[in-house]
UniProtKB/Swiss-Prot annotation:
GO terms for biological process: adenylate cyclase-activating adrenergic receptor signaling pathway; adenylate cyclase-activating G protein-coupled receptor signaling pathway; cAMP biosynthetic process; intracellular signal transduction. It is an enzyme of class 4 (lyase). The gene is adcy9. It is a multi-pass membrane protein. This is Adenylate cyclase type 9. Residues 607-618, 670-680 have a biased composition (Polar residues). ATP binds at residues 393-398, 435-437, 481, 1099, 1176-1178, 1183-1187, 1223. It comes from the Eukaryota. Adenylyl cyclase that catalyzes the formation of the signaling molecule cAMP in response to activation of G protein-coupled receptors. It holds the Pfam family Guanylate_cyc.
Length: 1305
């Protein structure tokens, strides 16, 4: 097992960050996340991500836990500290955000022009109906403005607008300022007296007027300021300066140039109270505008980051998926791998937990489909007919490896088997495994193909040519002996750990025999295989009888006729990598269906490049292997591949296609990703380097963290920008959001439900406030601004009664007190929910969790947002026809609560309804006065004077013409309120969409992040089942892995009577292997126990289980107990015996018998292969451990003398067996465990004599004993390789001692 530090690099990692709020200081921590099933209420959820710039530390629980810092959060992730100019702290991000969000800005500006045009058109209609004398002076500027707006609208569709959008917005703003301020220049009429009755008579005589009341003009001012802050897209400081200047000029011109003939009843200058009150109203509208501006920028940039993260996560997802495919394809064929990955994609949660399926907690057998419990684990094994099987052995390998060190030996095997792996892909064969110096593969399995025999023949001939090239490059003298047979096989995977795809059948055994009885340099085929071939090959009789004798031919071949193939009749020599031996079949799918099109294209290009390499002369530019043939050149110019990666012996790394694609700055990320991931010839080193590189980039890009050095941050930002520019998701995201265009609900009902519950979930999780866009802090801002507006409006409404020393209405005072108390309490609760929620009592938190639900929160928010409007209505109901100036001010003040509905984005579904009700109520109060019996009086007198006015005034005012001002006032306010409602509706819609898009971006990023983590866990789990984790960590920094271990333990455990259980007549033996799979799965479950973490399963060889301990140096650092791992391995062997006994108790008619061999000592561990990786161990220690098994006694553990001396000191009692004959070692003393008791009987004498040299495998296969693997050639003390007794003796002994090999059938 890897150390905790190393484990964080790949498995269950999470990046968390603490930002200081200004984005200038970020600390990155990598925390270990325990693998546990999350409890989610719904499909969509938001979790704390590393990109959020978390500004606090979560409280760990208890009063003594760390408390979060209570400080103002940053505006948004990666924002600068300048709140008056919200922007990213990176120029790359800021420019990309402006560019990607430009379509949204452009669309909003067009809407603004359309709104201005509609407003101008409505006011033109109003003026044309009501004005008689100044028709031209009002209509001409308005019509000109409409034409200008139309021109700007069409200009936004040109490319020039993108370059001058800010200047255009500023020009339109100044134009609107000029036009609206011009209406304030109203000519004074000195001919009018100050007497109200005379003015009324004069007005009645003319019957016309040409100006707006202060309600209409103030509504225009409000609309202009809202447009300035929300859709003109000018910098905040510029918008604020322009807005303040506009407010000052608006009120100044309105105060000095008011036309007293506009409304006769409104005669009189502005009072000081009105001037101050209007100033407070402007403060309110500017506060609302600034808040809308900041939150719009915050949400747009946050959404940009979230969508960008989704894009990056999508790229990472593709990388992780391709990486997972390559890793899983290294242990099983594509068709089986695709089925497994499809199941993992459909059931991601199950795929994440797949590793736990082999844990001790899940001892009950799993069921994948049936609802009723079954006793077997999921098991897939197929019986396929017409499959060609190839076995190939290196002739002369013993002599070649005699003077090689272990590291050099692994390197040679890697180089040679790497060539075979590439050749296997080209010939469409499926590699099964390597057995020492033996290589075997199949064709037509698991995907049937009619040319399976040709594939194997081409593979065999290509291997012969490849080893010839190998000999010329390495100056060695070796050759290949190849055997091919065609028949029926069982194919599948056994076990739950360190699994590999394998084949079993008697025909597999016969193919192995073809290789043993073959001739070096030729392909030995059976008569059945020859029936599938035509005359394209040079075929001759094998002459087995003449070469080996009649007895051998009769006993082993049993009359089977065989042939030798020396080559093709028109065969063209191939390069050293043996490419393009057969043409690629039309319609062959070279790519995974799950990869993106650009990845498939890269595979096709790679395949095409392979076809160009056909002759030895072209070795200098072979694109598939990258090798250069230098037959006559110096030795240091020859390339060698170690650990699956190629390197120059001269020292400098060779530039490869993979390296070039990743290091070329001119290439796009997509193309480099495709080239990197689709080259099936990439080694494990390349795979791990890609995983480390892309996973690291994924963390940097998805989190967008300004890591400790500026250059790193700039590089990651530049890469982030480069990737999102090539993706259309950003544009589609803003133009085609996944929401209903009418109701603004998400199209996904489950997502809508999750959205409505998101606020409550955040309160329940006590999520820390990270940015202004956080749900709880956003609500706090809304409540704070609402209370601020409420206070200012209350003060403004109290100024008039205060100046007249008249007490305000009782209803208004009571309502003011109640509303003020409610607003203050809501503000306190919002502050506590945002910053101090964890400090509250449990019952209080439960109450807040309840009221934070969708319905309670909307009800409370509706009450709060209506408080300012309720206060104003209380004044209107009392003083409506008492003071017309005060009434008009209240009508103007009522515009502020209507605008304020834009702030509550979380209540946007009901905000428009509330604003509509408010405006409609105002119009009803104007058209249907509450006191119709009381005539409107002169505003210049006090209330008492108005009440004592003479009856003659009533008679004068009974004229119907006197109602015209109020009729026009109602119509004017109706137009003003309608336009304001239209603007509020537009802004509400835009902000609601942006708020939902921000949430959807969070969800998408979180789902991608979760899925990527799931795939990383799957890939990590697969990687652990290919090679040990500590080996994978080493291969990240080195191109090869081979390590000598001085003290490692090895066991071989065989089911000795499985051959009696195995029967091919029933379903081809499939159900027999199902039982074996169950037993091996039980052995694998033992390894899942933490106590056995130091034990590594090496492989299964038929019905033999091989495991070792002491292979991880980080777990063997306890100098006080250097042999502790041996005790653990021995305990594991004992428990295997118990598992077999328990398994036999569940068997109805058969009892398996387990035999275990134990040994320890020095050995060599390494990884060989490129496309099909194999972690294996070699050495005398492995050889003796295998002999301890093959010469052992059933139901007992046989240990060597050296292991006995170590184990007996640990308290284990052994029986001394005596000496047994071990090939290569002579007579060895062995010991048995457990020790026989007096009444337990002696071990039968016939078992003591068991010393088979030829053993038929339990599944009927004839295999190669691990003693004949190259492990037997490595001496324990010096790491050198033993020399054999001669090639003739080796041929004779190999035919006799193929007992059990590393997986041959």
């Amino acid at each position: 097992m890897a150390s905790p530090v190393n484990q964080q690099l790949l498995h269950h990692t999470e990046v968390r960050c603490d930002g200081s709020g200004d984005g200038s200081s970020v600390t990155v921590r990598i925390n270990r996340q325990h693998h546990q099933a999350p409890s989610r209420r719904c499909k969509y959820s938001i979790s704390s991500s590393c990109s959020s710039g978390e500004s606090g530390v979560k409280k760990t629980g208890g009063s003594g836990g760390a408390r979060r810092q209570k400080k103002l959060p940053q505006l948004f992730e990666r924002s600068t500290s300048n709140w008056w100019n919200p922007k990213f702290d990176s120029n790359n991000l800021e420019e990309a955000c402006v560019e990607r969000c430009f379509p949204q800005t452009q669309r909003r500006f067009r809407y603004a022009l359309m709104y201005l045009s509609v407003a101008g058109l409505l006011w033109s209609i109003y003026f044309s109906v009501h004005m008689k004398t100044k028709l031209v002076s009002h209509l001409v500027p308005t019509l000109c403005f409409l034409i200008v707006c139309l021109g700007f609208f069409f200009f936004t569709f040109t490319k020039s607008y993108a370059r001058h959008c800010t200047a255009i917005s500023l020009l339109v703003t100044l134009l609107v300022f000029t036009l609206t301020l011009a209406s304030q220049f109203q000519v004074l009429n000195p001919g009018l007296g100050s007497d109200s009755l005379s003015n009324l008579t004069s007005f009645s005589a003319t019957g016309s007027s040409s100006c707006l009341s202060q309600v209409g003009s103030f509504s225009i001012c409000v609309e202009v300021l809202l447009l300035l802050y929300t859709v003109m897209h000018l910098p905040l400081y510029l918008s604020a300066c322009l807005g303040v200047a506009y407010s000052i000029l608006f009120e100044t011109f309105g105060y000095h140039f008011r036309d007293e003939s506009c409304f006769v009843l409104l005669v009189g200058r502005m009072a000081h109270w009105e001037l101050l009150s209007k100033a407070l109203l402007h403060v309110c509208i500017h506060a609302i505008g600034v808040h809308l501006f900041i939150m719009s920028e915050v949400r747009s940039r946050s959404t940009f980051l979230k969508v960008g993260q989704s894009i990056m996560h999508g790229k990472d997802l593709e990388v992780e998926k391709a990486l997972k495919e390559r890793m899983i394809h290294s242990v099983m064929p594509r068709i089986i791998a695709d089925d497994l990955m499809k199941q993992g994609d459909d059931e991601s949660e199950n795929s994440v937990k797949r590793h736990s399926a082999s844990s001790p907690k899940s001892r009950k057998k799993k069921s994948s489909i049936q609802k009723t419990p079954i006793i077997f684990r999921p098991f897939k094994m197929q019986r396929i007919e017409q499959v060609s099987i190839l076995f190939a052995d290196i002739v002369g390998f013993t002599k070649m490896s005699a003077n090689k060190s272990a590291h050099a030996l692994v390197g040679l095997l890697n180089d040679l088997f790497g060539r075979f792996d590439r050749l296997c892909e080209e010939t469409k064969c499926e590699k099964i495994s390597t057995l020492g110096d033996c290589y075997y593969c199949v064709a037509g399995c698991p995907e049937p193909r009619p040319d399976h025999a040709y594939c194997c023949i081409e593979m065999g001939l290509g291997m012969i040519e490849a080893i010839d090239q190998f000999c010329q490059e390495k100056k060695e003298m070796v050759n290949m002996r190849v055997g091919v047979h065609t028949g029926t096989v069982l194919c599948g995977i056994l076990g739950m750990r360190r699994f590999k795809f394998d084949v079993w059948s008697n025909d597999v055994n016969l193919a192995n025999l073809m290789e043993q009885l073959g001739v070096a340099g030729k392909v030995h085929i059976s008569e059945k295989t020859a029936r599938y071939l035509d005359d394209r090959y040079l075929m001759e009789d094998s002459m087995v009888v003449e070469r080996l004798g009649q007895i051998v031919a009769a006993d082993q071949l049993k009359g089977l006729k065989t042939f030798l193939i020396s080559g093709g009749r028109t065969r063209v020599p191939s390069c050293s990598c043996s490419q393009t031996l057969i043409p690629v079949q039309e319609g062959t799918d070279l790519s995974s269906p799950s990869l993106a099109p650009h990845v498939q294209a890269a595979i096709s290009e790679t395949s095409d490049s392979h076809t160009n390499c056909t002759q030895p002369e072209t070795l200098k530019s072979c694109p598939s292997c990258g090798e250069t043939a230098a037959r006559d050149g110096p030795e240091e110019g020859v390339s060698a591949a170690n650990g699956g990666g190629e390197e120059w012996k001269g020292g400098a790394p060779r530039p490869s296609a993979i390296g070039a694609s990743l290091k070329d700055p001119e290439r796009s990320p997509e193309s480099s990703t495709g080239d990197t991931l689709t080259n099936s010839q990439a080694s494990l080193y390349d795979m791990l380097q890609e995983k480390g590189r892309w996973c690291g980039v994924s963390m940097d890009q998805s989190a967008l963290l300004p890591l400790r050095f500026k250059n790193i941050r700039e590089k990651t930002d530049a890469h982030f920008v480069e990737v999102i520019k090539e993706d259309s998701l950003m544009k589609d995201y803003f133009f085609k959001p996944p929401i209903n265009p009418l109701s603004l609900n998400f199209l996904d009902k489950e997502l809508e439900t999750s959205y409505r519950a998101s606020y409550q979930e955040e309160v329940i999780r006590m999520a820390p406030v990270k940015t202004f866009a956080s749900a709880t802090f956003s609500s706090l801002q809304d409540v704070l601004l609402n209370y601020f507006i409420f206070v200012l409006l209350s003060v403004a409404c109290l100024l008039k009664p205060g100046t007249n020393t008249v007490s305000p209405p009782t209803l208004a005072l009571v309502l003011l007190s109640v509303c003020g108390l409610l607003g203050f309490l809501s503000l306190l609760v919002s502050v506590r929910m945002a910053f101090y929620l964890e400090d509250m009592l449990l019952c209080t938190r439960r109450l807040l969790e309840i009221i934070s639900g969708w319905v309670p929160r909307h009800f409370i928010g509706t009450v709060l947002v209506c408080l300012p409007a309720a206060v104003i209505f209380s004044y209107l109901s009392s003083d409506f026809y008492t003071d017309i100036h005060y009434t008009m001010f209240l009508c103007s003040a009522l515009l502020i609560p209507m605008v304020q509905y834009c702030n509550f984005c979380q209540l946007s579904s009901s905000a428009l309804l509330l604003a509509t009700i408010t405006g409609a109520t105002m119009l009803i109060l104007i058209y249907l006065p509450l006191c119709p019996q009381r005539p409107p009086l002169d505003p210049g007198t006090d209330i008492e004077a108005n009440l004592s006015t003479s009856n003659s005034s009533y008679e004068t005012l009974d004229n119907p013409r006197t109602e015209l001002p109020f009729t026009r006032l109602g119509q004017e306010i109706a137009v003003a309120y309608f336009l304001l409602l239209l603007l509020v509706w537009f802004l509400n819609r835009e902000f609601d969409v942006s708020y939902r898009l921000h949430y959807h971006g969070d969800v998408e990023a979180d789902l991608h992040r979760t899925k990527i983590q799931s795939m990383r866990d799957q890939a990590d789990w697969l990687l652990r089942n290919i090679i040990p984790y500590h080996v994978a960590e080493q291969l990240k920094v080195s191109q090869s892995y081979s390590k000598n271990h001085d003290d490692a333990g090895v066991i071989f455990a065989s089911i000795v009577n499985f051959s009696e259980f195995y029967e091919e007549n029933y379903e081809g033996g499939k159900e027999c292997y199902r039982a074996l799979n169950e037993l091996i799965g039980d052995f694998d479950e033992l390894l899942s126990k933490p106590h056995y973490s130091c034990i590594e399963k090496i492989k299964t060889i038929g019905a033999t289980y091989m495991a070792a301990s002491g292979l991880n140096p980080s777990q063997c650092q306890d100098s006080s107990q250097p042999h502790r791992h041996l005790q653990t391995l021995f305990e594991f062997a004992k428990e295997m015996m118990s598992v077999v006994d328990e398994f036999n108790n569940n068997m109805l008619w058969f009892n398996f018998k387990l035999r275990i061999g134990f040994n320890h000592g020095p050995l060599t561990a390494g990884v060989i292969g490129t496309t099909k990786l194999l972690y294996d161990i070699w050495g005398d220690t492995v050889n003796i451990a295998s002999r301890m098994d093959t010469t052992g006694v059933e139901c007992r553990i046989q240990a060597s003398e050296e292991s006995y001396r170590v184990l007996v000191k640990m308290g284990y009692d052994f029986d001394y067996r005596g000496t047994v004959n071990v090939k290569g070692k002579g007579q060895m003393k062995t010991y048995h465990f457990p020790k026989c008791t007096d009444n337990g009987g002696l071990v039968p004498h016939h078992q003591l004599c068991i010393s088979p040299d030829i053993r038929v495998q339990v599944d009927g296969s004839i295999g190669r004993s691990p003693t004949d693997e190259i492990s037997s050639l490595v001496t324990g003390g010096k790491g050198a390789v033993e020399l054999g007794s001669g090639e003739a003796e080796r041929k004779r002994e190999k035919a006799e001692e193929r007992g059990r090999d590393g997986g041959a059938r």
